[in-house]
Amino acid sequence: MKKTGYFLLAVIVIVAAAGVGYWKFSGNPDALREIVLEQCLPDQLQHQNPAPCAEVKPRAGYVVFKDRHGPLQYLLMPTYRINGTESPLLLEPATPNFFWLAWQARDYMSKKYGHDIPDSAVSLTVNSRLGRSQDHLHIHISCIRPDVREQLDNDLTRISTRWLPLPGGLMGHEYLARRVTESELAQRSPFMMLAEEVPEARDHMGRYGLAVVRQSDGSFVLLATQRNLLTLNRASAEEIQDHQCDILK
């Protein structure tokens, strides 16, 4: 009887998660790609004007775009077709280190805000295949939630240079955490670190959401959460961000 009950519960959870996914994808999943490929890139190449993007770097392979959600949130996106974390292109050595480029683009937040924003308030995230609304790779550059900031500060000395479970997880979901230096982040993509260092991750990259946060000692913490429908975790790493930026108040 108990086994039947657990099975029915699992079915209900999976159906509910699928329903959320359907609702989330009911809009135009190619909207960001169309903005990049049909507006920003042509405008930059033909008129040296990045609009509606804030910046377009054709040779470097990326754009920076002001997201409509939140006063300071920006997105960094490739200038060519990469759907998301599941793309094999992200594991190619020739592919730009999009997370590092996104970190360099954090200054757009300060310019928009009118004051310098401390690195400790900034976070970068990318959602899993199920946890995203758009089928064009986009890294969210935005503020970190104050409670997540506090937890990561408290866990500073417990975060290893290897991928290990973060004690207590974040936002009710399990996360892996790994500490890296600024030099490591600049030289090696977090996508590649996850694929090469976490068992079986390479074959299931689309199930993962990733985040990058600066720590008080100058290091960075990489965070990865894997899709788990039984716990209603769609691996939307964006959950650690606060697009209203209460941390600045």
From Swiss-Prot:
It catalyses: a CDP-1,2-diacyl-sn-glycerol + H2O = a 1,2-diacyl-sn-glycero-3-phosphate + CMP + 2 H(+). Pfam families: CDH. It is found in: Cell inner membrane. The keyword Chloroplast does not apply. Its EC number is 3.6.1.26. GO terms for cellular component: plasma membrane. The keyword Transmembrane applies. It comes from the Bacteria. GO terms for molecular function: CDP-diacylglycerol diphosphatase activity. Belongs to the Cdh family. This is CDP-diacylglycerol pyrophosphatase.
